[in-house]
């Protein structure tokens, strides 16, 4: 995205956030900035193109290493293919389910600003304020610790784990509570997987995910604001937060038709794209597995982890 385009989005965003949130901590402002990055990333000018590009490069690498194997067809079965058919199989991208993905993405993008700003700009800072107040009552005044890069790494890790836990709980509940499943099953109605499938949601699902995200960011932000007496920023790599890097890449590839397994030892800690393919499978042995967004920790603790074997059959729907 060009710098002028970024300023077009970010400057009004900062003004709106300041008006809605007020002078809370720097952590709240960082949360606000992250919120608006998410909104901006859903605009047609920036559909996570960096992660999509990395996805394609990695897919080419898989095609080379596996000599044309690893791609899935619309029936969910692995099949060898030439490079172009490996990357863009016709039976997937012309499938009616893929066309529905496009329409639901457009709908989600139009509706998101209507509820996203309100929920994220109120729930997050409110949770942060409540956490700071609770710690002050229970323990005392903010500690005012010195911010180091090690603390920034810890803040990034705790934010990731807290977000992933809240995501796991919401996702698990959506599969267990009939009323919530009626909302979430729109996502699981996808018969093929494309990068746009990540946005294939009922219009009521977005506010639920947004509220959960804001709650997790706010609670962690409150703890670290109390520890340091002010805001702390997340550690970055190439000017991108570690959390955003992991989530963005994983989100793009796990709704891609190429199966990408991690080594088993790594799959015990991080969700591979192939593990999310299991989550989308309609085989009964795959039901209600792999609920978390990034890590495998919560699925391991709650007994819902499923690590697929190489080229395991995963029909979607």
What are these model-predicted stretches?
Residues 22-39, 84-86, 134-147:
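Interfacial loop/helix-cap signal at membrane boundaries in integral membrane proteins
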Residues 42-46, 232-234:
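Interfacial loop-to-helix junctions that mark the boundaries of transmembrane helices
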Residues 107-120, 126-137, 141-315:
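Membrane-embedded catalytic scaffold of the fatty acid hydroxylase/desaturase
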Residues 16-24, 69-90, 172-188:
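Short, charged cytosolic
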Residues 1-43:
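Short, strongly hydrophobic alpha-helical membrane anchors
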Residues 24-29, 85-96, 265-268:
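Short, membrane-interfacial amphipathic segments enriched in basic
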Residues 46-137, 155-167:
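Specific transmembrane helices
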Residues 84-85, 90, 308-317:
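Membrane-embedded helix-turn/re-entrant segments that form the catalytic/gating core
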């Amino acid at each position: 995205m060009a710098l002028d385009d970024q300023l077009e989005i970010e400057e009004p965003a900062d003004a709106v956030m300041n008006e809605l949130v007020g002078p809370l901590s720097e952590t709240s402002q960082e949360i606000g900035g992250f919120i608006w990055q998410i909104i901006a990333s859903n605009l047609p000018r920036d559909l996570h193109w960096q992660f999509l590009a990395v996805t394609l490069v990695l897919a080419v690498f898989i095609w080379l290493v596996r000599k044309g194997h690893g791609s899935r067809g619309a029936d969910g079965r692995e099949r060898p293919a030439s490079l172009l058919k490996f990357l863009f199989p016709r039976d997937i991208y012309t499938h009616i389910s893929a066309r529905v993905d496009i329409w639901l993405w457009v709908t989600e993008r139009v509706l998101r600003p209507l509820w996203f700003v309100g929920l994220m700009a109120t729930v997050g800072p409110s949770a942060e304020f409540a956490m700071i107040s609770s710690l002050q009552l229970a323990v005392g005044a903010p500690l005012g610790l010195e911010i180091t890069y090690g603390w920034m790494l810890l803040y990034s890790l705790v934010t990731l784990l807290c977000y992933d836990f809240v995501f796991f709980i919401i996702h698990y509940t959506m599969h267990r509570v009939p009323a919530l499943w009626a909302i979430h099953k729109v996502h699981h109605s996808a018969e093929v997987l494309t990068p746009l499938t990540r946005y294939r949601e009922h219009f009521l699902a977005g506010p639920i995910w947004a509220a959960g995200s804001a709650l997790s960011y706010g609670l962690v932000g409150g703890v670290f604001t109390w520890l340091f007496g002010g805001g702390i920023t997340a550690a970055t790599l190439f000017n991108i937060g570690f959390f955003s890097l992991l989530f963005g890449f994983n989100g793009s590839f796990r709704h891609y038709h190429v199966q990408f397994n991690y080594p088993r030892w790594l799959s015990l800690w991080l969700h591979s794209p192939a593990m999310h393919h299991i989550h989308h499978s309609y085989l009964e042995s795959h039901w209600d597995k792999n609920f978390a967004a990034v890590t495998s920790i919560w699925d391991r603790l709650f007994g819902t982890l499923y690590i697929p074997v190489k080229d395991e059959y995963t029909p979607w729907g």
